């Protein structure tokens, strides 16, 4: 069967640039099951055409005048999917992506035909109104195997379970990598299973044991990693290498760059001084880059974009890349199969290895992909053989985590899904955790959660279970109840910035900064009168204090060793928690709300209070705002009335940018006058 034989409008073919492809068997079978009104789990390798199945399901749902929600586990994947699914606009669909604010109303979904959300965003929207799902005909769960991820998995599982509980008629399309218990996942979702090992680009896997290459049943001696990489690049291929640490990614990329000439005209630059710009610009002209979570969001996006454009030929990355965006290459090398963790050295999981190697072979460019594991000892060689010859681990639910049960129990009561302990159990019966673990363990966890929530003032029984004002606000804000208690503690003491950032830093959502400056942390605690306070929270607080004093990323890296990407991740969470603190002030201390709202904006932007107005102008971040302020333009009105020549004279402002900023400032100023 070809795409044209699906019976769709001819414009559907344009989603594939007019190419009338023959459907793969698993695509045809999945679409057949979807047309029968079945839930479907599709378990196939990377780049095996799952997107076409999603296109088809979303388009058919649109033709039935129903909406589709597409769930992904990561923001980077949401942006990638939005770029792909936006092509459906040519068929008349209204497509929207939403990945930010967790306090939004879900009403906007009614205005669109297809909405792309992260798991967390979807879950937070359902906290406000789960019955929005009654307007939804299709729920696409991408990367459903990530349910087995301890940190991200429970949220995806929760969204799927709420959907099935609230609207049993919603169709579910779950897209998965190859997993060993795909049938169990299908059974949980009451779905048909479509499973295949087919790959459009064949994959060859092997082991490089020191200088011995074992590939396709053959052995080749005297082979080095550098040699294989050079041969691949010279044959117009691209390479991904995975290593165990950031430092190793940087050092290995620098070493590999030496084997190539500086032919590529690639340079990265940021508005703000950033330690990694210089490091990358040393090797980018040679077509090599490193990629890890310490890079800023913009730096990672730049590297991914240049790799897709085939200007960057080699990326050395940590395993975070394999869990993120779809970035295939002809050759994938897993350089390290172990990593350091809190419990010492451990082996990567089979699923992680398969996710990395599965990226070998770029459709449309490569006739085949090669996935290699490099090892240097006999024991590692045996481990590598096991990786290549065995299936990935089964997907196991982590929804029974104590904090997750407490969080979801409060949410179920707040959403109106549960009015009694038995109602809560009915909800949990729709989860994978229940199907894998049964009732007894859950009853114990639910009982403990209810006691905690009632004791701490989140719920009450009268006689039905109801949320208090604190419980409702906590659930709507999408924060952990324990974190809400930490934030509430703030209102019992001095209402100043230092105390606020300390209590924000106490919250479990913020991973403490691992800095060695105990003295400054203890001094901070002494200054705020909490000498026996939490030293890890104090360390985070002093970094946040530097951030809102406009410390640059370079300064923070030089002083604390904090990479830009790590800083951005903490800022994002501190932004949300400071917003939550301002919301909670309406209950506990309304007179400090304005101060907390200002602090929220300062954390979001990394600014002192004097440039608050200027960062409200679109396109003006903290660096440009400070330059405008120092040049005497200290308000939106000042910018709106300035001449382009005056702004153009400020460092970093082009003629185009100056005119755009003036225009935007005038728009804001005119609205304020009205």
From Swiss-Prot:
Binding site for ATP: 27, 44-51
Enzyme Commission no: 5.6.2.4
Secretion signal, residue range per the UniProt entry: none
Catalytic reaction(s) noted: Couples ATP hydrolysis with the unwinding of duplex DNA by translocating in the 3'-5' direction; ATP + H2O = ADP + phosphate + H(+)
Domain Helicase C-terminal: start-end pairs: 224-411
Pfam families with a match to the protein in the record: DEAD, Helicase_C, Helicase_dom4_arc, HHH_5, HTH_61
Motif DEAH box per UniProt: ranges: 142-145
InterPro entries: DEAD/DEAH_box_helicase_dom, Hel308-like_dom4, Hel308_SKI2-like, Helicase_ATP-bd, Helicase_C-like, Helicase_Hel308, HTH_61, P-loop_NTPase
Keywords: ATP-binding, DNA damage, DNA repair, DNA-binding, Helicase, Hydrolase, Isomerase, Nucleotide-binding
Domain of life (superkingdom): Archaea
Xref: Gene3D superfamilies: 1.10.3380.30, 5' to 3' exonuclease, C-terminal subdomain, P-loop containing nucleotide triphosphate hydrolases
CDD domains: SF2_C_Ski2
Any one GO MF annotation of this record: 3'-5' DNA helicase activity
Gene Ontology biological process terms from the UniProt entry: DNA repair
Domain Helicase ATP-binding: 31-197
Similarity section: Belongs to the helicase family. Hel308 subfamily.
Function (record text): DNA-dependent ATPase and 3'-5' DNA helicase that may be involved in repair of stalled replication forks.
Alphabetized NCBIfam families for the sequence: PRK01172.1 (NF002251)
Subunit structure: Monomer.
Protein name per its UniProtKB record: ATP-dependent DNA helicase Hel308
